[in-house]
Amino acid sequence: MSTYGTLLKVTSYGESHGKAIGCVIDGFLSNIEINFDLIQKQLDRRRPNQSKLTSNRNEKDKLVILSGFDENKTLGTPITFLIYNEDIKKEDYNSFINIPRPGHGDYTYFMKYHVKNKSGSSRFSGRETATRVAAGACIEQWLYKSYNCSIVSYVHSVGNIKIPEQVSKELENKNPPSRDLVDSYGTVRYNEKEKIFMDCFNRIYDMNASMLKTDEYNKNTLTIPSIDNTYINVKTNECNINQVDNNHNNYINDKDNTFNNSEKSDEWIYLQTRCPHPYTAVQICSYILKLKNKGDSVGGIATCIIQNPPIGIGEPIFDKLEAELAKMILSIPAVKGIEFGSGFNGTYMFGSMHNDIFIPVENMSTKKESDLLYDDKGECKNMSYHSTIQNNEDQILNSTKGFMPPKNDKNFNNIDDYNVTFNNNEEKLLITKTNNCGGILAGISTGNNIVFRSAIKPVSSIQIEKETSDFYGNMCNLKVQGRHDSCILPRLPPIIEASSSMVIGDLILRQISKYGDKKLPTLFRNM
């Protein structure tokens, strides 16, 4: 089916090489102010032809609003978004219309609908995900304004290249990065002439992602785009974390969420990995470019963190929160698996280790500037923002410094800044000291961050010739033509973020329809 949701329904329509694609949101609340620029920003993060790492199909993905708004406020009527397909090349698929492509849906599509697809993957194409990004980017604005709930996804690994385990725990358990930080730290500059990479801290690497020392490469021979270097120690190339906190907003405050457009040089190409670990981002770029030259593809893992979800959403038994999220995330092309919290690693733990102990939230807010964080053992503690940085500074790799979001980052919640809602005078709002459950117990949200990881298979369209059978049983050689990604991971985070917001939004309305808004407490409320 092309519709998701019970009360908040999203229907997508259109084909990859048709005239347009789009979506209809039905059941959305009225009088919600929507920033269309934020929707377009998410579409831009997903669109193809962002860099040499992605498909060169040149789609602008400009949002067209057809209905549901009076200026920028919702009417409560169906919202209709449209996105025109501008770079259509159906002829790329003419040569193999009678050959089901390995790894694609051509064969199963034909067996179900008795139609041979003449224009790529049609409804099964990743092109469809642009519609859910538009819908989700609209819904998530309501989630943030009403519940202070925000969602961030990022690339954890590509192939066997992954964020170091210690840093991964830091991001999942302590301080989830903002989207701007993901895009900033995930940006890598590539000099095709010199065959070198440069990360966001101006560290230079060769084509194998090996860092070059200053005496091995003379930076003075390069025209380096100027970024705010006030927090970079030139001698050690290390980062002053406190200064990063102060300068972060200026650092990412530009059109592309990376570096200032006016400072870009023709010598440099900007590659976006959406991996919030600079060194790993460079490794990913090197790996994908090599695979692209070989005509092959690769998959990986994407992490998603739903911050401050309302407590009590999820419908046991068959509409559990993780079941609904899994249904939605697995509907994204190329996603083949999902795990929550400790996931499969939890199978190696004892129950005494895995059980998440409850504590009153009020016990976590005894200091004026204390933050709700998790220590190295995964236990929730009251920790000063900067003291946490100091305690971990010697333990974290140099390339991971600066991960703490600034105190004024809207995605970083201070527990003392919000009103905690209690059910009544006797029952207290609780939180778990650890989060092995991933923010979900018995299919219902606990209020802790919901953490899950998605397994992404390699893109099926590759430029390597393979022997396969046509529809008539004749063996033949096939080399897929067209414009395709070698790795879909850099474009995936906004899709996962949008898909998650659709699920959370629908479950909130289902809960409200039964018990009213007063039964939806959150750990952190907007003032």
Curated annotation (Swiss-Prot):
<keyword id="KW-0028">Amino-acid biosynthesis</keyword>
<protein>
    <recommendedName>
        <fullName>Chorismate synthase</fullName>
        <ecNumber>1.5.1.38</ecNumber>
        <ecNumber>4.2.3.5</ecNumber>
    </recommendedName>
</protein>
<dbReference type="GO" id="GO:0004107">
    <property type="term" value="F:chorismate synthase activity"/>
</dbReference>
<dbReference type="GO" id="GO:0009423">
    <property type="term" value="P:chorismate biosynthetic process"/>
</dbReference>
<feature type="active site">
    <location>
        <position position="104"/>
    </location>
</feature>
<dbReference type="GO" id="GO:0009073">
    <property type="term" value="P:aromatic amino acid family biosynthetic process"/>
</dbReference>
<comment type="similarity">
    <text>Belongs to the chorismate synthase family.</text>
</comment>
<dbReference type="GO" id="GO:0008652">
    <property type="term" value="P:amino acid biosynthetic process"/>
</dbReference>
<dbReference type="Pfam" id="PF01264">
    <property type="entry name" value="Chorismate_synt"/>
</dbReference>
<dbReference type="InterPro" id="IPR000453">
    <property type="entry name" value="Chorismate_synth"/>
</dbReference>
<feature type="active site">
    <location>
        <position position="485"/>
    </location>
</feature>
<keyword id="KW-0560">Oxidoreductase</keyword>
<comment type="pathway">
    <text>Metabolic intermediate biosynthesis; chorismate biosynthesis; chorismate from D-erythrose 4-phosphate and phosphoenolpyruvate: step 7/7.</text>
</comment>
<dbReference type="GO" id="GO:0010181">
    <property type="term" value="F:FMN binding"/>
</dbReference>
<dbReference type="GO" id="GO:0005829">
    <property type="term" value="C:cytosol"/>
</dbReference>
<feature type="active site">
    <location>
        <position position="17"/>
    </location>
</feature>
<keyword id="KW-0456">Lyase</keyword>
<keyword id="KW-0963">Cytoplasm</keyword>
<dbReference type="InterPro" id="IPR035904">
    <property type="entry name" value="Chorismate_synth_AroC_sf"/>
</dbReference>
<keyword id="KW-0057">Aromatic amino acid biosynthesis</keyword>
<comment type="function">
    <text>Bifunctional chorismate synthase and flavin reductase. Catalyzes the conversion of 5-enolpyruvylshikimate 3-phosphate (EPSP) to form chorismate. Acts also as a flavin reductase (FR) able to generate reduced flavin mononucleotide in the presence of NADPH.</text>
</comment>
